[in-house]
UniProtKB/Swiss-Prot annotation:
Family assignment from sequence similarity: Belongs to the mab-21 family.
Binding-site positions, GTP: D190, R229, A230, S231, F232, Y233, R234, Q235, E236
Listed name of the protein: Cyclic GMP-AMP synthase-like receptor
Pfam families: Mab-21 (PF03281), Mab-21_C (PF20266)
Annotated binding of ATP, by residue: S60, E72, Y73, D74, Y233, R234, Q235, E236, K254, S268, Y269, F270, I271, K272
Catalyzed reactions: GTP + ATP = 3',2'-cGAMP + 2 diphosphate; GTP + ATP = pppA(2'-5')pG + diphosphate; pppA(2'-5')pG = 3',2'-cGAMP + diphosphate
GO molecular function list: 3',2'-cyclic GMP-AMP synthase activity; ATP binding; double-stranded RNA binding; GTP binding; metal ion binding
EC nos: 2.7.7.-
Keywords: Antiviral defense, ATP-binding, GTP-binding, Immunity, Innate immunity, Magnesium, Manganese, Metal-binding, Nucleotide-binding, Nucleotidyltransferase, RNA-binding, Transferase
Record's function text: Nucleotidyltransferase that catalyzes the formation of cyclic GMP-AMP (3',2'-cGAMP) from ATP and GTP and plays a key role in innate immunity. Synthesizes 3',2'-cGAMP in a two-step reaction through production of the linear intermediate pppA(2'-5')pG. Acts as a key sensor of double-stranded RNA (dsRNA), the presence of dsRNA in the cytoplasm being a danger signal that triggers the immune responses.
Swiss-Prot/TrEMBL cofactor(s): Mg(2+); Mn(2+)
Length: 368
């Protein structure tokens, strides 16, 4: 291994190494075909066709920070209820970052309108006695729609003469479809429903534009549960978009996470949250600095959050994203991050061949 002139050169090589463009097109073409087929079939359901209001690519692909084989996709499909501005949104004070959706005014309005007769019948089945939308009732309707579609497709899809098997599962708020063609080609798609709401209905933050309420279930799948997670993906995209080195460092932090077994509980959204907070504190010009300076800063921020066992949800500080993690896990992640940060700082001061190898090992599963 040739010794590089400085740490910046090493980090540039790492940044180039984690680019996945080579395989992106193969997966993307198959995924586009699956996505279009599934949505076209779902819209044959009269009720879902009425509620469906487009979709957006979410997760790492939507943010353009995917670093591994492109085999996982997140799709948020928007649900827009009739008279949606009449939905009364209130904060769930027992679960920060979550909201309740009260359909009382919606029911009163559409009950008088014949064109809403069918959707009204279904909507009443999804509400509790106080007209709050219930997470599992609504999710079971969507589940039935996906199962009907996949059954009609015989749980298979053919693209360019090659047939793949399809398997359905519920993963958190997502309706997940696993696609398998061979041992060397498989991927999954998380279809996540997002109930569209307006900026003036947001009770957790001051925002511009629409946002979504995500039907994220409780661990016990309580059928009476009526609390939805507030999601601001559009606003988050704007914050991290066109920020020079931001996405390069973001990808590298994810690659660090992926290469360390004791970091796998550091969710992608947690890493994203660190960048959202950093963007709120720094001037736009900050992201034009060298990779070396920014990545050491981000390791320090991650280290600080783990040491304090606190990472506030960007849109509601009362929610600590680390809340469900045990102290032992936090210490394991802290030790890993601290070690990486120390290596980077040493390499920034004086790069040697052993240090260079250790820097590569921070981001890649290499044996020295």
């Amino acid at each position: 291994m040739e010794l590089q002139a400085n740490l910046e050169n090493v980090l540039q090589k790492v940044n180039n190494f984690i680019n996945i463009d080579a395989k992106r097109q193969i997966y993307a073409a198959h995924f586009d075909n699956l996505k279009n087929t599934i949505f076209n079939e779902l819209r044959k359901n009269e009720v879902l066709a009425y509620l469906f209001n487009g979709f957006q690519l979410g997760g790492s692909y939507g943010d353009n920070v995917k670093v591994t084989v492109p085999n996982e996709y997140d799709l948020v499909f928007n649900i827009k209820f009739p008279e949606q501005p009449l939905i009364i949104v209130t904060a769930d004070h027992e679960l920060p970052g979550n909201v309740f959706l009260d359909f009382t005014r919606v029911i009163h309005k559409i009950a008088k309108e014949k064109q809403h007769e069918k959707i009204l019948q279904h909507l009443k089945q999804w509400l509790d006695d106080e007209n709050y939308l219930k997470v599992e009732k609504f999710q079971w309707f969507l589940r039935s729609c996906f199962i009907d579609v996949l059954t009609k497709m015989n749980f298979k899809i053919t693209f360019k003469g090659r047939t793949s098997s399809l398997r359905y599962s519920r993963e958190g708020p997502a309706h997940t479809i696993k696609v398998t063609e061979s041992l060397n080609f498989d991927y999954s798609v998380d279809f996540v429903p997002g109930i569209l709401l307006n900026a003036n209905q947001c009770v957790t933050s001051n925002i511009v534009g629409q946002w979504e309420a995500i039907p994220k279930p409780t661990p016990t799948n309580n059928h009476l549960y009526k609390s939805f997670r507030a999601s601001f993906y559009r606003q988050e995209q704007k914050i991290i978009k066109n920020q020079q080195q931001l996405k390069n460092v973001y990808r590298m932090m994810k690659k660090f996470r992926d290469s360390k077994t004791n970091m796998l509980k550091m969710k992608s959204y947690f890493i994203k949250t660190l960048f959202l907070w950093k963007s709120s504190r720094e001037n736009v010009s900050y992201w034009s600095k060298p990779l070396t300076e920014i990545i050491i800063d981000m390791f320090k921020d991650m280290e600080k959050s783990l040491r304090e066992e606190k990472l506030p949800f960007y849109w509601d500080r009362k929610l600590n994203l680390y809340d469900n993690y045990q102290p032992r896990l936090m210490r394991e992640m802290l030790n890993c991050v601290e070690s990486a940060r120390e290596t980077l700082e040493k390499a920034a001061k004086e790069l040697t061949l052993p240090l260079q190898k250790r820097v590569f090992c921070i981001f890649c599963k290499l044996k020295i």
